[in-house]
Amino acid sequence: MAGTAATVFRNVRPYGAERPVDLFAVDGVLAERLPDGAEPVVVEGGGRIALPTLVDAHIHPDKTAWGEPWYSRRPAASLPEYVEGDVDLHHHLATPLAERAHRLLAHAVASGTRAVRAHVDVAPAYGLAGVTGLAEARERLAGALDVQLVAFPQHGVRRTPGAGELLAEAAASGLIDAVGGIDPAGFDGGPDGEGPAQLDLVFGLAERHGLRLDVHLHDVGARGLDPLRDIVARTRAAGLAGRVVVSHAFCVPEISGDRLAALADELAEAGVGLTTVAPSAHQVLPFRELQARGVRVGLGSDGVRDSWSPYGNADMLHRAHLLGWTTDARTDQELADCFALAADGGADLLDLPRVTLRPGSPADFMLVAGECLPQVVVDLPARELVVRGGRVVARDGRHLG
Protein backbone atom coordinates (compact mmCIF):
# COMPACT_ATOMS: atom_id res chain seq x y z
CA MET A 1 0.00 0.00 0.00
CA ALA A 2 1.55 3.28 -1.12
CA GLY A 3 2.46 5.67 1.69
CA THR A 4 2.23 3.01 4.42
CA ALA A 5 5.33 2.39 6.54
CA ALA A 6 5.28 -1.30 7.41
CA THR A 7 7.86 -3.53 9.07
CA VAL A 8 7.71 -7.17 10.11
CA PHE A 9 9.86 -8.18 13.07
CA ARG A 10 10.09 -11.93 12.66
CA ASN A 11 10.68 -14.55 15.30
CA VAL A 12 10.56 -12.51 18.52
CA ARG A 13 9.28 -13.44 21.99
CA PRO A 14 7.19 -10.68 23.62
CA TYR A 15 8.04 -10.51 27.34
CA GLY A 16 9.98 -13.77 26.97
CA ALA A 17 7.07 -15.88 25.73
CA GLU A 18 7.93 -19.50 25.04
CA ARG A 19 6.92 -19.43 21.36
CA PRO A 20 8.29 -16.81 18.95
CA VAL A 21 5.83 -14.70 16.95
CA ASP A 22 6.00 -12.00 14.30
CA LEU A 23 5.27 -8.37 15.23
CA PHE A 24 3.70 -6.18 12.53
CA ALA A 25 4.39 -2.44 12.74
CA VAL A 26 2.24 -0.22 10.52
CA ASP A 27 2.69 3.55 10.60
CA GLY A 28 4.27 3.42 14.04
CA VAL A 29 1.67 1.16 15.66
CA LEU A 30 1.58 -2.59 16.17
CA ALA A 31 -1.07 -4.27 14.03
CA GLU A 32 -2.74 -7.66 13.95
CA ARG A 33 -1.71 -8.08 10.34
CA LEU A 34 -0.26 -6.12 7.44
CA PRO A 35 -2.63 -4.17 5.20
CA ASP A 36 -3.30 -5.55 1.74
CA GLY A 37 -0.63 -4.58 -0.73
CA ALA A 38 1.94 -3.61 1.90
CA GLU A 39 5.58 -4.07 1.01
CA PRO A 40 7.15 -4.36 4.44
CA VAL A 41 10.73 -4.17 5.57
CA VAL A 42 11.58 -7.47 7.24
CA VAL A 43 13.79 -7.60 10.35
CA GLU A 44 14.84 -10.98 11.72
CA GLY A 45 14.56 -11.18 15.50
CA GLY A 46 16.36 -14.48 15.95
CA GLY A 47 14.21 -15.56 18.89
CA ARG A 48 15.20 -12.55 20.98
CA ILE A 49 12.95 -11.25 23.77
CA ALA A 50 10.89 -8.18 22.81
CA LEU A 51 10.33 -5.74 25.67
CA PRO A 52 8.78 -2.26 25.79
CA THR A 53 11.25 0.59 25.63
CA LEU A 54 11.47 2.60 28.83
CA VAL A 55 10.69 6.07 30.18
CA ASP A 56 13.18 8.07 32.23
CA ALA A 57 10.95 10.25 34.40
CA HIS A 58 13.76 12.29 35.97
CA ILE A 59 17.16 13.12 34.43
CA HIS A 60 19.52 16.14 34.38
CA PRO A 61 21.24 16.03 30.96
CA ASP A 62 22.38 19.66 31.06
CA LYS A 63 24.81 18.90 33.90
CA THR A 64 26.45 15.83 32.39
CA ALA A 65 30.12 15.26 31.67
CA TRP A 66 29.27 12.03 29.80
CA GLY A 67 31.93 11.37 27.17
CA GLU A 68 34.19 14.14 28.49
CA PRO A 69 37.66 13.74 30.02
CA TRP A 70 37.55 12.60 33.64
CA TYR A 71 36.49 15.31 36.06
CA SER A 72 37.76 15.03 39.65
CA ARG A 73 34.97 16.02 42.00
CA ARG A 74 35.57 17.91 45.20
CA PRO A 75 33.86 16.86 48.45
CA ALA A 76 30.44 18.40 49.08
CA ALA A 77 28.34 18.06 52.23
CA SER A 78 25.38 20.35 51.59
CA LEU A 79 23.02 21.36 48.81
CA PRO A 80 24.64 24.81 48.41
CA GLU A 81 28.03 23.13 47.96
CA TYR A 82 26.65 20.79 45.29
CA VAL A 83 25.14 23.78 43.50
CA GLU A 84 28.53 25.52 43.52
CA GLY A 85 30.01 22.37 42.00
CA ASP A 86 27.48 22.56 39.16
CA VAL A 87 28.66 26.05 38.26
CA ASP A 88 32.33 25.04 38.40
CA LEU A 89 31.77 22.05 36.11
CA HIS A 90 29.70 24.13 33.69
CA HIS A 91 32.64 26.51 33.24
CA HIS A 92 35.20 23.68 33.20
CA LEU A 93 33.70 21.79 30.25
CA ALA A 94 34.67 22.96 26.76
CA THR A 95 32.04 20.95 24.87
CA PRO A 96 28.84 22.96 24.33
CA LEU A 97 25.94 21.98 26.56
CA ALA A 98 23.73 21.07 23.60
CA GLU A 99 26.32 18.61 22.31
CA ARG A 100 26.88 16.99 25.71
CA ALA A 101 23.14 16.63 26.27
CA HIS A 102 22.63 15.15 22.81
CA ARG A 103 25.47 12.68 23.37
CA LEU A 104 23.93 11.47 26.62
CA LEU A 105 20.37 11.28 25.31
CA ALA A 106 21.50 9.43 22.17
CA HIS A 107 23.10 6.91 24.51
CA ALA A 108 19.80 6.68 26.38
CA VAL A 109 18.04 5.85 23.10
CA ALA A 110 20.60 3.14 22.35
CA SER A 111 20.00 1.75 25.85
CA GLY A 112 16.29 1.36 25.20
CA THR A 113 14.71 4.64 26.34
CA ARG A 114 11.81 6.14 24.37
CA ALA A 115 11.08 9.26 26.47
CA VAL A 116 12.67 11.39 29.18
CA ARG A 117 11.67 14.22 31.46
CA ALA A 118 14.75 16.45 31.45
CA HIS A 119 15.26 18.92 34.30
CA VAL A 120 17.32 21.88 33.11
CA ASP A 121 18.89 24.43 35.45
CA VAL A 122 17.61 27.98 35.10
CA ALA A 123 19.68 30.44 37.14
CA PRO A 124 21.61 33.70 36.69
CA ALA A 125 24.82 31.64 36.44
CA TYR A 126 23.59 30.15 33.13
CA GLY A 127 20.63 32.22 31.96
CA LEU A 128 18.51 30.09 29.65
CA ALA A 129 21.48 28.28 28.06
CA GLY A 130 20.25 24.95 29.39
CA VAL A 131 16.76 25.44 28.00
CA THR A 132 17.95 26.38 24.52
CA GLY A 133 20.65 23.69 24.53
CA LEU A 134 18.23 20.93 25.48
CA ALA A 135 15.69 22.20 22.96
CA GLU A 136 18.39 21.80 20.30
CA ALA A 137 19.21 18.26 21.46
CA ARG A 138 15.50 17.42 21.51
CA GLU A 139 15.10 18.56 17.91
CA ARG A 140 18.05 16.44 16.78
CA LEU A 141 16.53 13.35 18.41
CA ALA A 142 12.99 13.86 17.15
CA GLY A 143 11.48 10.57 16.05
CA ALA A 144 13.76 8.56 18.33
CA LEU A 145 13.12 10.13 21.74
CA ASP A 146 10.39 12.23 23.33
CA VAL A 147 11.89 14.92 25.57
CA GLN A 148 9.86 16.89 28.09
CA LEU A 149 11.77 19.93 29.38
CA VAL A 150 11.43 21.19 32.95
CA ALA A 151 12.80 24.65 33.76
CA PHE A 152 14.37 23.86 37.13
CA PRO A 153 15.44 26.59 39.62
CA GLN A 154 18.28 24.54 41.13
CA HIS A 155 19.71 27.63 42.85
CA GLY A 156 16.35 28.56 44.38
CA VAL A 157 14.20 31.59 43.64
CA ARG A 158 14.00 33.17 47.10
CA ARG A 159 17.72 32.80 47.79
CA THR A 160 18.91 33.73 44.26
CA PRO A 161 17.95 37.20 42.96
CA GLY A 162 16.96 37.08 39.29
CA ALA A 163 16.12 33.37 39.24
CA GLY A 164 12.38 33.98 39.44
CA GLU A 165 12.49 36.33 36.47
CA LEU A 166 14.45 33.79 34.43
CA LEU A 167 11.94 31.10 35.35
CA ALA A 168 9.15 33.34 34.10
CA GLU A 169 11.09 33.97 30.88
CA ALA A 170 11.53 30.23 30.36
CA ALA A 171 7.83 29.66 31.00
CA ALA A 172 6.94 32.19 28.30
CA SER A 173 9.51 30.87 25.80
CA GLY A 174 7.40 28.07 24.36
CA LEU A 175 10.37 25.71 24.76
CA ILE A 176 9.50 24.02 28.04
CA ASP A 177 6.81 21.58 29.12
CA ALA A 178 6.95 22.08 32.88
CA VAL A 179 8.07 24.46 35.60
CA GLY A 180 10.21 23.09 38.41
CA GLY A 181 10.74 23.90 42.05
CA ILE A 182 13.06 22.91 44.88
CA ASP A 183 12.68 22.39 48.63
CA PRO A 184 10.33 25.31 49.28
CA ALA A 185 10.64 25.09 53.07
CA GLY A 186 14.30 24.10 53.34
CA PHE A 187 16.90 25.14 50.78
CA ASP A 188 14.67 27.85 49.29
CA GLY A 189 12.56 28.62 52.36
CA GLY A 190 12.51 31.72 54.52
CA PRO A 191 14.42 32.10 57.79
CA ASP A 192 11.69 30.23 59.68
CA GLY A 193 11.32 27.52 57.05
CA GLU A 194 8.28 29.02 55.38
CA GLY A 195 8.02 28.30 51.66
CA PRO A 196 4.81 29.68 50.15
CA ALA A 197 6.63 32.30 48.04
CA GLN A 198 8.27 29.75 45.75
CA LEU A 199 5.08 27.71 45.38
CA ASP A 200 3.09 30.88 44.67
CA LEU A 201 5.48 31.63 41.80
CA VAL A 202 5.72 28.19 40.22
CA PHE A 203 2.02 27.36 40.48
CA GLY A 204 1.22 30.78 39.05
CA LEU A 205 3.53 30.20 36.08
CA ALA A 206 2.11 26.73 35.48
CA GLU A 207 -1.45 28.04 35.45
CA ARG A 208 -0.68 31.13 33.38
CA HIS A 209 1.21 29.29 30.65
CA GLY A 210 -0.60 25.95 30.67
CA LEU A 211 2.49 24.09 31.87
CA ARG A 212 3.04 21.07 34.07
CA LEU A 213 4.81 21.27 37.41
CA ASP A 214 7.60 19.07 38.80
CA VAL A 215 9.05 19.99 42.21
CA HIS A 216 12.23 18.52 43.72
CA LEU A 217 11.59 17.72 47.39
CA HIS A 218 14.65 16.42 49.24
CA ASP A 219 13.62 17.59 52.72
CA VAL A 220 12.57 15.04 55.31
CA GLY A 221 10.28 15.23 58.32
CA ALA A 222 7.87 18.15 58.59
CA ARG A 223 9.98 20.25 56.22
CA GLY A 224 9.15 17.72 53.53
CA LEU A 225 5.66 16.57 54.47
CA ASP A 226 4.21 20.05 55.06
CA PRO A 227 5.18 21.37 51.58
CA LEU A 228 4.04 18.07 50.06
CA ARG A 229 0.58 18.55 51.56
CA ASP A 230 0.64 22.20 50.47
CA ILE A 231 1.37 21.05 46.91
CA VAL A 232 -1.54 18.61 47.13
CA ALA A 233 -3.89 21.37 48.28
CA ARG A 234 -2.70 23.81 45.61
CA THR A 235 -3.06 21.15 42.91
CA ARG A 236 -6.67 20.58 43.92
CA ALA A 237 -7.43 24.30 44.07
CA ALA A 238 -5.86 24.98 40.65
CA GLY A 239 -7.51 22.00 38.95
CA LEU A 240 -4.10 20.61 37.96
CA ALA A 241 -4.81 16.94 38.65
CA GLY A 242 -2.49 14.74 36.63
CA ARG A 243 -0.15 17.65 35.83
CA VAL A 244 1.88 17.91 39.05
CA VAL A 245 4.78 15.68 40.12
CA VAL A 246 6.97 15.73 43.21
CA SER A 247 10.43 14.28 42.60
CA HIS A 248 12.42 12.32 45.20
CA ALA A 249 9.99 12.98 48.10
CA PHE A 250 12.44 11.57 50.64
CA CYS A 251 9.92 12.36 53.39
CA VAL A 252 7.54 9.66 52.12
CA PRO A 253 9.69 6.55 52.87
CA GLU A 254 9.97 7.79 56.47
CA ILE A 255 6.32 6.99 57.16
CA SER A 256 4.45 3.71 57.00
CA GLY A 257 1.21 1.98 57.89
CA ASP A 258 -1.88 4.14 58.27
CA ARG A 259 0.10 7.39 57.83
CA LEU A 260 1.46 6.24 54.48
CA ALA A 261 -1.95 5.00 53.36
CA ALA A 262 -3.59 8.31 54.26
CA LEU A 263 -0.93 10.32 52.43
CA ALA A 264 -1.17 8.05 49.39
CA ASP A 265 -4.93 8.58 49.30
CA GLU A 266 -4.41 12.36 49.38
CA LEU A 267 -1.89 12.20 46.52
CA ALA A 268 -4.09 9.93 44.42
CA GLU A 269 -7.23 12.01 44.96
CA ALA A 270 -5.41 15.22 44.01
CA GLY A 271 -3.68 13.62 41.03
CA VAL A 272 -0.15 14.37 42.28
CA GLY A 273 2.49 11.90 41.04
CA LEU A 274 5.90 11.03 42.48
CA THR A 275 9.26 9.99 41.04
CA THR A 276 12.08 8.03 42.61
CA VAL A 277 15.62 7.42 41.40
CA ALA A 278 16.11 4.47 43.78
CA PRO A 279 19.15 6.09 45.43
CA SER A 280 19.25 3.86 48.51
CA ALA A 281 17.18 1.42 50.52
CA HIS A 282 16.00 4.12 52.94
CA GLN A 283 15.28 6.82 50.31
CA VAL A 284 13.54 4.79 47.60
CA LEU A 285 9.79 5.35 47.43
CA PRO A 286 7.54 2.46 48.57
CA PHE A 287 6.18 2.33 45.04
CA ARG A 288 4.09 -0.81 45.38
CA GLU A 289 2.13 0.56 48.34
CA LEU A 290 1.68 3.91 46.60
CA GLN A 291 0.54 2.39 43.32
CA ALA A 292 -1.88 0.08 45.13
CA ARG A 293 -3.70 3.20 46.37
CA GLY A 294 -3.75 4.87 42.96
CA VAL A 295 -0.64 7.08 43.07
CA ARG A 296 1.28 7.42 39.80
CA VAL A 297 4.98 6.71 40.38
CA GLY A 298 7.84 7.00 37.89
CA LEU A 299 11.51 6.01 37.89
CA GLY A 300 14.44 8.10 36.69
CA SER A 301 18.22 8.33 36.31
CA ASP A 302 18.73 11.67 38.10
CA GLY A 303 22.23 13.08 37.50
CA VAL A 304 24.58 11.25 35.14
CA ARG A 305 28.35 11.64 35.47
CA ASP A 306 28.02 15.22 36.76
CA SER A 307 29.48 17.33 39.57
CA TRP A 308 27.28 15.62 42.13
CA SER A 309 28.41 12.09 41.36
CA PRO A 310 30.74 10.15 39.04
CA TYR A 311 28.03 7.48 38.66
CA GLY A 312 25.03 7.09 36.37
CA ASN A 313 24.62 5.96 32.77
CA ALA A 314 21.13 6.98 31.53
CA ASP A 315 20.31 3.28 31.12
CA MET A 316 16.80 2.71 32.45
CA LEU A 317 17.11 -1.07 32.39
CA HIS A 318 20.07 -0.66 34.72
CA ARG A 319 17.97 1.70 36.85
CA ALA A 320 15.26 -0.99 37.09
CA HIS A 321 18.03 -3.36 38.23
CA LEU A 322 19.09 -0.82 40.90
CA LEU A 323 15.46 -0.47 41.99
CA GLY A 324 15.39 -4.23 42.47
CA TRP A 325 18.60 -4.05 44.48
CA THR A 326 17.43 -1.23 46.78
CA THR A 327 14.02 -2.84 47.37
CA ASP A 328 15.49 -6.34 47.86
CA ALA A 329 13.49 -7.74 44.93
CA ARG A 330 13.94 -11.51 44.76
CA THR A 331 10.88 -13.14 43.21
CA ASP A 332 10.08 -13.05 39.51
CA GLN A 333 7.07 -10.82 40.20
CA GLU A 334 9.12 -8.36 42.26
CA LEU A 335 11.69 -8.08 39.47
CA ALA A 336 8.93 -7.67 36.87
CA ASP A 337 7.44 -4.89 39.03
CA CYS A 338 10.75 -3.01 38.84
CA PHE A 339 10.73 -3.26 35.04
CA ALA A 340 7.10 -2.14 34.92
CA LEU A 341 7.92 1.00 36.91
CA ALA A 342 10.54 1.90 34.29
CA ALA A 343 8.22 1.05 31.39
CA ASP A 344 4.72 2.04 32.53
CA GLY A 345 5.22 4.24 35.59
CA GLY A 346 7.05 6.95 33.68
CA ALA A 347 4.68 6.66 30.73
CA ASP A 348 1.76 7.36 33.04
CA LEU A 349 3.51 10.37 34.60
CA LEU A 350 4.41 11.85 31.21
CA ASP A 351 0.95 11.10 29.76
CA LEU A 352 2.32 8.71 27.15
CA PRO A 353 0.53 5.57 25.99
CA ARG A 354 1.78 2.38 27.55
CA VAL A 355 3.56 -0.12 25.33
CA THR A 356 1.81 -3.50 25.57
CA LEU A 357 3.28 -5.22 22.50
CA ARG A 358 -0.29 -6.00 21.42
CA PRO A 359 -2.16 -4.65 18.38
CA GLY A 360 -2.86 -0.95 18.89
CA SER A 361 0.24 -0.43 21.02
CA PRO A 362 3.00 1.97 19.98
CA ALA A 363 5.64 0.01 18.06
CA ASP A 364 8.29 0.93 20.63
CA PHE A 365 10.37 -1.99 21.85
CA MET A 366 13.84 -3.47 22.22
CA LEU A 367 15.24 -6.90 21.45
CA VAL A 368 17.51 -8.61 23.97
CA ALA A 369 18.88 -12.10 24.54
CA GLY A 370 17.64 -14.08 27.51
CA GLU A 371 15.18 -16.58 28.89
CA CYS A 372 12.63 -14.34 30.61
CA LEU A 373 11.92 -10.81 31.83
CA PRO A 374 13.16 -11.27 35.43
CA GLN A 375 16.46 -12.62 34.12
CA VAL A 376 16.81 -9.59 31.84
CA VAL A 377 16.39 -7.23 34.83
CA VAL A 378 19.16 -9.07 36.66
CA ASP A 379 21.57 -9.81 33.78
CA LEU A 380 21.24 -6.50 31.87
CA PRO A 381 21.88 -7.95 28.39
CA ALA A 382 22.93 -5.75 25.48
CA ARG A 383 20.13 -3.92 23.70
CA GLU A 384 20.70 -5.51 20.29
CA LEU A 385 17.92 -3.58 18.56
CA VAL A 386 15.84 -0.58 19.65
CA VAL A 387 12.67 0.25 17.73
CA ARG A 388 10.73 3.52 17.91
CA GLY A 389 7.50 3.94 15.97
CA GLY A 390 8.26 0.77 14.03
CA ARG A 391 11.63 2.09 12.88
CA VAL A 392 15.01 0.77 14.05
CA VAL A 393 16.69 3.70 15.84
CA ALA A 394 19.60 1.89 17.52
CA ARG A 395 21.55 -1.28 16.98
CA ASP A 396 24.12 -2.99 19.20
CA GLY A 397 24.34 -0.08 21.62
CA ARG A 398 24.64 2.64 18.99
CA HIS A 399 22.09 5.28 18.04
CA LEU A 400 21.57 5.31 14.28
CA GLY A 401 20.56 8.96 13.95
Each model region followed by its residue ranges:
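Active-site gating loops and adjacent loop-to-helix segments of metal-dependent hydrolytic enzymes
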Residues: 64-97, 209, 227-245, 263-266, ...
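C-terminal cap of metal-dependent C-N hydrolases
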Residues: 359-401
